[in-house]
C-alpha cells in the first residue's frame, strides 16, 4: 500500500441531536466526494451509512459505521455516530478515536439536549469541532438563533465563516466571509454537485463586511501570531493567513468555526468539506497518544503517529457482517499493520492473528494489504479482542487508556420458548454484548430468567429486535424494569462471622471480622486487608474479597446490587485441616450480608435528566405532570418562543411518558431524557419496591 501523507488525512465524526440531519449530511459528503452514486435518503430507508435493518426502519443511526472517502487530495475517514441518547456509548467510543468532529445543528431548534451531551463528550476527549447549521431551508429556521444557542448552551465562542443568502424556502447559498465571495446553488438539477462563485449580493455587502470584521477580531483575540498581522493592517491580511489562524484556533479549541447549509436540498455541503480539510486536525496535529506498560500503570508510555514507531492499535467497535462474520474496527495509532501479522492483545495478554484488512465504505468494503499510523480500518480474524482493548507489537507492549462505559439503568427478562432457542440466545447474547459493552446480561438466581440491561427503552428494543431478526431467537419478553441499587448509610465498625460445618471427615472452618464503611456516590468498591500476624493465611484473603463481592451483587433489602462501599478485613481465624478457600469465601459473603443489615441499608433509584420543550399554553400541565411523577424542577427558560423545563425525574415514573405528553399537549411538546445519577428512594416508594421484590420469596 502506498504510504499516505498524514497531513492529508482527516479522521472525523459527524455528531448531532437525533433528526438534525446528520445521516443526510454524511450521505451528501459521500455523494459529492464520488463514493456514493445514488443519494440515499433516511426518509425512504436507503441511506448508505445506516446499514442495520432496524436503523433503516426507525430512521435513526444506531451503529457507527466507518467509511473512507476523498475530497480533492485529502482522505477523509468518517465515523457516523448515533444521535439518540440511548446510544451515547457509541458516540463516546467513536470520539475516542477521532481527531476532529463536525457538530450538526437543526436550523430551527438550534442546540438541543443531545447536542449538549455529545459536545461535552467531545470536550472530554479534547476533540476540536466545527459547527454546521443545517436545514436552513425549513420554515422557522434562524441562523442567528442557532449561533446564539451555540454561545449560550454550549458556552462556545462561535467564529462565523459564512452567512446564509436567503431564508427558509428562499435559501440559495452562502457568503464566504474568509474569501469574501458568494457561493450559490441555483438549479435543483445535478443534486447540487455544482455551484456558482460570484460577487456578494449588493444588499448583503454591509452585513458581510461587519461579520468579517467581527470574525477577524475574534480570531485575533485568540491567536497572538494573527493579532500582530491584524493590528499592523487589518486590510492587508491574506486569505491564507486568515485560514491558518482559524485552523490554529480550532485545533486549540479556543473557538469553534461555524458553517451553514441545507443538506437535504444539496446546498452548502462542499464548503463544509473545504472547512473539514482547512480547519480540522490531521493525525499529526494531535498529541502523541499515551498509555502504560502492561502490569505496571506507573510506567507511562507514548506513541507518535509514525509508521516507524512500534505498532499500537485501539479496537473501538465490533460489528457482525452478515457475509464476513465478526469485523473489528480499529484505529492504528503508530506503526504499520499487515494482513497476517501476529499481534499482542495487551489488555488481556493474549496473542491474536490479523486476518484480512478492509477499508470500509459504509457497508461496502475494499481489501487492503497493510495500513499505517493514523488510519482507521476494519480487520477480520480477531477472536478474543473486544471494544476498548489494545493490540500492539509483542516486543514493545503498551495498553492505551481504555474507555469507561456507564452502568445500565433499565432491564428486561427474556425467556426462550424452547431448548433450541436457549442455545441461539446464548450465541446472540455473546455477539451483541461483544459489540456493545453497555448491554449487561445476567441470570436471575431465583427465576433462572436471562436479564438484559441497557441504557434505555430504545436500546433494549434494538437488542431484542436484533436477537429475533439476526439470530432467530423465539422468546417471551418481560416488561422493562428499573435497575435499582442498594446503598449502606452507616458504618459498621466490627462484625464477626464464623463459618463452621462438621459432617464427618474434614469439615469447614473460617472466621472473619470485617468493618464496612459507606462511601460517596461513584466510589465503587474497595477491599482492604488489615490482617496482621498471619491470623488468616495470605492465600485465603482473595477468597474473602470474592465472597464479599458476590454478596454485594444481591443486597439485603430487595436483592439489588450494593454500591459505593469500603470493606476492611480486620482479623479472623483458621483451622489447619478444616479451612479452605471455599470456607473463607462463604464466611466473607455471609459476614457482609449480616453486617449490611446493621448498616441501615437504603434503596437507590436512577434519576433521569428530562428536558421538555412546550408552548406556553401547556406549561402548567407539563410542570404539574412532572411533579406528579416525583420530578424535581431544576430550571425553566424561554427558547425560541417555547418554554423549556429541565427536571430530574425517577426513571420508574417515566415509562409511557412519550404518549402521555403527546395527549396532554396535543402533540405540541417534545422531550429528551438521559441518565443523570442514582438518588435515594423515598421510604414510601422503597417500601413498595422491597415488598414486591420479597413477595415471591
Swiss-Prot record:
Binding-site residues for GTP, renumbered to this chain: 16-23, 80-84, 134-137
InterPro entries: EF-G-like_DII (IPR053905), EFG_II (IPR041095), EFG_III (IPR009022), EFG_III/V (IPR035647), EFG_IV (IPR047872), EFG_V (IPR035649), EFG_V-like (IPR000640), G_TR_CS (IPR031157)
Domain named tr-type G: residues: 7-284
Gene Ontology MF term list: GTP binding; GTPase activity; translation elongation factor activity
Gene3D superfamilies (alphabetical): 3.30.230.10, 3.30.70.240, Elongation Factor G (Translational Gtpase), domain 3 (3.30.70.870), P-loop containing nucleotide triphosphate hydrolases (3.40.50.300), Translation factors (2.40.30.10)
GO cellular component, one term: cytoplasm
GO biological process: ribosome disassembly
SUPFAM superfamilies per record: EF-G C-terminal domain-like, P-loop containing nucleoside triphosphate hydrolases, Ribosomal protein S5 domain 2-like, Translation proteins
Location(s) in or outside the cell: Cytoplasm
Record keywords: Cytoplasm, Elongation factor, GTP-binding, Nucleotide-binding, Protein biosynthesis
Role noted for this protein: Catalyzes the GTP-dependent ribosomal translocation step during translation elongation. During this step, the ribosome changes from the pre-translocational (PRE) to the post-translocational (POST) state as the newly formed A-site-bound peptidyl-tRNA and P-site-bound deacylated tRNA move to the P and E sites, respectively. Catalyzes the coordinated movement of the two tRNA molecules, the mRNA and conformational changes in the ribosome.
HAMAP family registered for this protein in UniProt: EF_G_EF_2_B (MF_00054_B)
Family that this chain belongs to: Belongs to the TRAFAC class translation factor GTPase superfamily. Classic translation factor GTPase family. EF-G/EF-2 subfamily.
NCBIfam families attached to this UniProt entry: EF-G (TIGR00484), PRK12740.1-3 (NF009379), PRK12740.1-5 (NF009381), small_GTP (TIGR00231)
Protein name in UniProt: Elongation factor G
Natural source organism: Cutibacterium acnes (strain DSM 16379 / KPA171202)
Amino acid at each position: 500500500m502506498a504510504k499516505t501523507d498524514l497531513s492529508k488525512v482527516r479522521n472525523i465524526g459527524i455528531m448531532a441531536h437525533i433528526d438534525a440531519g446528520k445521516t443526510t449530511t454524511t450521505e451528501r459528503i459521500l455523494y459529492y466526494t464520488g463514493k456514493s452514486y445514488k443519494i440515499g435518503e433516511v426518509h425512504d430507508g436507503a441511506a448508505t451509512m445506516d446499514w442495520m435493518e432496524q436503523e433503516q426502519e426507525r430512521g435513526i443511526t444506531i451503529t457507527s459505521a466507518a467509511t473512507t472517502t476523498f475530497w480533492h487530495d485529502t482522505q477523509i475517514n468518517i465515523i457516523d455516530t448515533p444521535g439518540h441518547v440511548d446510544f451515547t456509548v457509541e458516540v463516546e467510543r467513536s470520539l475516542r478515536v477521532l481527531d476532529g468532529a463536525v457538530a450538526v445543528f437543526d436550523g430551527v431548534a438550534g442546540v438541543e439536549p443531545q447536542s449538549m451531551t455529545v459536545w461535552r463528550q467531545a470536550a472530554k476527549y479534547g476533540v476540536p469541532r466545527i459547527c454546521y447549521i443545517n436545514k436552513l431551508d425549513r420554515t422557522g429556521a434562524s441562523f442567528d438563533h442557532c449561533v446564539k444557542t451555540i454561545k449560550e448552551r454550549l458556552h462556545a465562542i462561535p467564529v462565523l465563516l459564512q452567512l446564509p443568502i436567503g431564508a427558509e424556502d428562499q435559501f440559495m447559498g452562502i457568503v464566504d466571509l474568509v474569501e469574501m465571495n458568494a457561493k450559490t446553488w441555483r438549479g435543483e438539477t445535478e443534486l447540487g454537485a455544482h455551484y456558482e462563485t460570484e460577487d456578494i449580493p449588493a444588499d448583503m455587502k454591509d452585513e458581510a463586511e461587519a461579520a468579517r470584521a467581527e470574525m477577524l477580531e475574534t480570531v485575533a483575540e485568540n491567536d497572538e501570531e494573527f493579532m500582530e498581522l491584524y493590528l499592523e493592517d487589518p486590510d492587508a491580511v491574506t486569505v491564507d493567513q486568515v485560514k491558518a489562524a482559524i485552523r490554529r484556533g480550532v485545533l486549540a479549541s479556543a473557538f469553534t468555526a461555524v458553517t451553514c447549509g441545507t443538506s437535504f436540498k444539496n446546498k452548502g455541503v462542499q464548503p463544509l468539506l473545504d472547512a473539514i480539510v482547512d480547519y480540522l486536525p490531521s493525525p499529526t496535529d494531535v498529541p502523541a497518544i499515551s498509555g502504560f506498560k502492561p502490569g505496571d500503570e506507573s510506567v507511562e508510555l507514548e506513541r507518535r503517529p509514525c509508521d516507524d514507531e512500534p505498532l499500537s492499535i485501539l479496537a473501538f467497535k465490533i460489528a457482525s457482517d452478515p457475509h464476513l462474520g465478526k469485523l473489528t474496527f480499529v484505529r492504528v495509532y503508530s506503526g504499520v499493520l499487515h494482513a497476517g501479522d501476529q499481534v499482542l492483545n495487551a489488555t488481556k495478554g493474549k496473542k491474536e492473528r490479523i486476518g484480512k484488512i478492509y477499508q470500509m465504505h459504509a457497508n461496502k468494503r475494499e481489501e487492503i494489504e497493510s495500513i499505517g499510523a493514523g488510519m482507521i480500518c476494519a480487520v477480520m480474524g480477531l477472536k478474543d479482542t473486544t471494544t476498548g482493548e489494545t493490540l500492539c507489537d509483542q516486543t514493545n507492549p503498551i495498553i492505551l487508556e481504555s474507555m469507561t462505559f456507564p452502568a445500565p439503568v433499565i432491564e428486561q427478562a427474556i425467556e426462550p420458548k424452547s431448548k433450541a432457542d436457549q442455545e441461539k440466545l446464548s450465541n446472540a447474547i455473546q455477539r451483541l454484548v461483544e459489540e456493545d459493552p453497555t448491554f449487561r446480561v445476567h441470570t436471575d438466581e431465583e427465576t433462572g430468567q436471562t436479564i438484559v440491561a441497557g441504557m434505555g427503552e430504545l436500546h433494549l428494543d434494538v437488542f431484542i429486535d436484533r436477537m429475533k431478526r439476526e439470530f432467530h431467537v423465539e422468546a417471551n419478553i418481560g416488561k422493562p424494569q428499573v435497575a435499582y441499587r442498594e446503598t449502606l448509610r452507616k458504618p459498621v465498625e466490627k462484625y464477626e462471622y464464623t463459618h463452621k460445618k462438621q459432617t464427618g471427615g474434614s469439615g469447614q472452618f473460617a472466621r472473619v471480622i470485617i468493618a464496612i464503611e459507606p462511601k460517596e456516590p461513584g466510589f465503587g468498591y474497595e477491599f482492604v486487608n488489615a490482617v496482621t500476624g498471619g491470623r488468616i493465611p495470605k492465600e485465603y484473603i482473595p477468597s474473602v474479597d470474592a465472597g464479599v463481592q458476590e454478596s454485594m451483587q444481591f443486597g439485603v433489602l430487595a436483592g439489588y446490587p450494593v454500591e459505593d462501599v469500603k470493606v476492611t478485613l480486620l482479623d479472623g481465624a483458621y483451622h489447619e485441616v478444616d479451612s479452605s478457600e471455599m470456607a473463607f469465601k462463604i464466611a466473607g459473603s455471609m459476614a457482609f450480608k449480616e453486617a449490611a443489615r446493621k448498616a441501615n441499608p437504603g434503596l437507590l433509584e436512577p434519576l433521569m435528566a428530562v428536558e421538555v420543550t412546550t408552548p406556553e399554553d401547556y406549561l402548567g400541565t407539563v410542570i404539574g405532570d412532572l411533579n406528579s411523577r416525583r420530578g424535581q424542577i431544576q430550571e425553566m427558560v424561554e427558547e425560541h418562543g417555547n418554554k423549556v423545563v429541565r427536571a430530574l425525574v425517577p426513571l420508574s415514573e417515566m415509562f409511557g411518558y412519550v404518549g402521555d405528553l403527546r395527549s396532554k399537549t396535543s402533540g405540541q411538546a417534545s422531550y429528551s431524557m438521559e441518565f443523570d445519577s442514582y438518588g435515594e428512594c423515598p421510604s414510601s416508594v422503597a417500601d413498595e419496591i422491597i415488598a414486591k421484590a420479597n413477595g415471591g420469596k
